[in-house]
Amino acid sequence: MMTSFFDQFASPYLLGIPLILVAMLLPWLLFPAPTSRWINNRLITVQTWLTGRFTNQLMTPLNFSGHKWALLFASLMVFLITINLLGLLPYTFTPTTQLSLNMGFAVPLWLATVIIGMKNQPTIALGHLLPEGTPIPLIPALIIIETISLFIRPLALGVRLTANLTAGHLLIQLIATAVFVLLPMMPAVAILTASVLFLLTLLEVAVAMIQAYVFILLLSLYLQENI
């Protein structure tokens, strides 16, 4: 019996062993590996086309030196989309509802973009901390504000992904609970609520894909500032 709505976000254990690693490795088993044949099957063709489209959208604003990040960004985006969608299945666990995991993705990648900027073009990277045309009396305050906003970026990335997925899962569970409670007492209202639940589930599927795309898109924008 579930004692709390937030119990669904707790990492599952089996014989004292956390199963979050299994939940993170499972998505890679669902994608077919490319074959050496001249003609691939439809699933591989669609997978390649979608990955290429997403990668093209992400890499178009970047110059040539940033294209080396294409494989990393595309792989991470497909990984996040798959994890988010698998988490919508009944009796499954969504690792991306854990802030620690999302911060583990966000902080190293954000830090890598900052280090690249400081290494390749330190003057421009530091110039982002002070907007052009700032009055002299406001310079110290703006530098502090821009520095704080720079360090908040990875936190915003992780919290945005965690909060959106957590809120969606909670809404689905609340409405599903309401359907089961209303079914014996008011069947008509329960059916109407179930239709709302169906629409909300479709919306959550879209949110699961959009949030993964936004996560990678913001990382690509941070990279664009530093290359």
Curated annotation (Swiss-Prot):
Q: How does it sit in the membrane?
A: Multi-pass membrane protein
- Name the PROSITE patterns for this protein: ATPASE_A
Report the record's Gene Ontology biological process terms. Answer: proton motive force-driven ATP synthesis; proton transmembrane transport
**Keywords on this record?**
ATP synthesis, CF(0), Hydrogen ion transport, Ion transport, Membrane, Mitochondrion, Mitochondrion inner membrane, Transmembrane, Transmembrane helix, Transport
Q: Where in the cell is it found?
A: Mitochondrion inner membrane
Q: Which InterPro entries match?
A: ATP_synth_F0_asu (IPR000568), ATP_synth_F0_asu_AS (IPR023011), ATP_synth_F0_asu_bact/mt (IPR045083), F0_ATP_A_sf (IPR035908)
Q: Please name the Pfam families in this protein's record.
A: ATP-synt_A
The catalysed reaction is: H(+)(in) = H(+)(out)
What GO CC terms are in its UniProt record? mitochondrial inner membrane; proton-transporting ATP synthase complex
Job of this protein: Subunit a, of the mitochondrial membrane ATP synthase complex (F(1)F(0) ATP synthase or Complex V) that produces ATP from ADP in the presence of a proton gradient across the membrane which is generated by electron transport complexes of the respiratory chain. ATP synthase complex consist of a soluble F(1) head domain - the catalytic core - and a membrane F(1) domain - the membrane proton channel. These two domains are linked by a central stalk rotating inside the F(1) region and a stationary peripheral stalk.
Q: How does it assemble?
A: Component of the ATP synthase complex composed at least of ATP5F1A/subunit alpha, ATP5F1B/subunit beta, ATP5MC1/subunit c (homooctomer), MT-ATP6/subunit a, MT-ATP8/subunit 8, ATP5ME/subunit e, ATP5MF/subunit f, ATP5MG/subunit g, ATP5MK/subunit k, ATP5MJ/subunit j, ATP5F1C/subunit gamma, ATP5F1D/subunit delta, ATP5F1E/subunit epsilon, ATP5PF/subunit F6, ATP5PB/subunit b, ATP5PD/subunit d, ATP5PO/subunit OSCP.
What family name appears in the similarity comment? Belongs to the ATPase A chain family.
Q: What is this protein called?
A: ATP synthase F(0) complex subunit a
